[in-house]
Amino acid sequence: MDRQSLLAFLLIGIIIVFYPWYMSLVSPVDVSTSDEYVVEQKASFDVEETPKRQKTQSIGNNNSSPLQTINVKTNLYDLTISNKSGGSLMSYSLYSFSDHSDKLVNLIDELNSNNLLLSFISVDGDKVSLNHNWSPLSSSRTISVDKGQKSLTYSTRYQGQTIEKKLTFYPDSYNIDIEVLFNQPSKFISRNQYNLGWSGGLPPTEKNISNDYQFFEGFASLGGEHMGAKPKKGKLTEESQKGSTLWSAIKTKYFISAIVPNDPGIAARVESELVDKRPVYNTEITQSTSSSNSFTLYLGPLDYDNLKAFDVDLESNVDLGWALFRPIGQLISWMLTKMYAIIPNYGVVVILFAFLIKLLLNPLTVKTFESTRKMQALAPEINKIKEKYKNDPQKMSRAQMELYKSSGANPMGGCLPMLIQMPILVSVFSIFRSKIEFRGAPFFGWIDDLSVPDTLTELGGFPINILPVLMGSTMFIQQKMMAAPNADANQKTMMYVMNAFFLFLFYSFPSGLNLYYFVFNLLSIIQQKYMIPNPVEAGSVVPLKK
């Protein structure tokens, strides 16, 4: 989770939970880059002890086959694949997704174009990377996959033995099946263990590149636990581990590259580094030649249903909020998708969803307001107690508790109902910031993409965003309604500062998120003004016994 999200979660949570209690005490009611192909690969993680290494070699170093490309077109993407590394993807354009310049999103660039690399430790103890000398077993240079699956096989030789890599494409799926075929691997592969890796991570796809980078991550799943490595400036970090490996994945804000072995791998490695401020991840799965030697590459959107279909918890890469609240996040995401199937405008869906959440939380909201108003009505008596027992904290505490008990008030009564809402708050915040369906989804007028700020125009290069201002305004009105007319200068200053801070925090957030909070706040104002019972009058509190 990026720092901005974490900061927002903490601040919103603290304010929502404790603000009613604070207001009840202080506001008494007034009653009335370019990367060369790697020739020498870093030695991979070895599951068992290997013989002493003499050298690192890459097949085809001195006598590489000429580069040959094949174009593969499905109903979902346009792929250019080369014979390098036995089928490296050189470009991968998604028909359903465009970038900020209205070009198709391409998930391959120069930095990650040497992907799907096979490597192993030879029986001589050398690290062998199968970069070159691969040839396609088909003369066709174009493959159209519109009905049924189609396959493409590349072949190379090492020490007289044949190695093949077969790739299978499907018309309506982002899955690419990969099958590795070895001829007598025990003759040239140490301990019959090899690696399949993805190098170079994924490129940024969003206009706000720095924000996109905040979501970049690389993981491998071993025994149900995620293993990752955090990128550091000027340093390559690495994590490697033995164990049943279900998948390795590299993701951005909206897209993911994942390799899922048909049989669990026996180890994994994750590397990370910063390349010109870009977090770059490399992943590698170690597999045994005695397994099925089959993998599936998923390269496409961070779609929950697509990833869940693998049944290996790959969908955990979709941000649905904190792990403890994921079931709630799943329900919210499902509701939004189902509502969109009926009303094909996510802006309208967001508004209706805000209505539903407000309706669901109405009993808790009423209880919070009632508790806050009751505490505000008690504030004059509380102040008298503080003045009377200012030199005796214990008597002051006992007197306050007696007052609360006799009046039926609870100083924390407004906090608990708000605390119960936290799981929904956290889930909504996460989902609305990174839900793939919001990407490029228009609402109306100038709001043409719910995944980015609703910039109406720019003044001197500064974006003029409308929804954050509306959200901040409704928040300010709410606080004014909660505060007493005779609030002192410090209370008013705090209110202004808090609103300014939230306006600053939300100003660069996606318009879908700001639209939700604007509508939710607006409904809260209406509810507070017309639907909440009248506040407790000052004369209704039970006076403190002398």
Walk through the language-model features, giving the residues of each.
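Juxtamembrane extramembrane loops of integral membrane proteins
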Residues: 12, 25-102, 106-107, 154, ...
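Soluble non-transmembrane domains of integral membrane proteins
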Residues: 71-316
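Preference for short coil/turn "hinge" residues that link or interrupt alpha-helices
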Residues: 65, 100, 160-162, 431, ...
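Aromatic/His-enriched, Gly/Pro-containing loop or helix-boundary segments
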Residues: 1, 62, 143
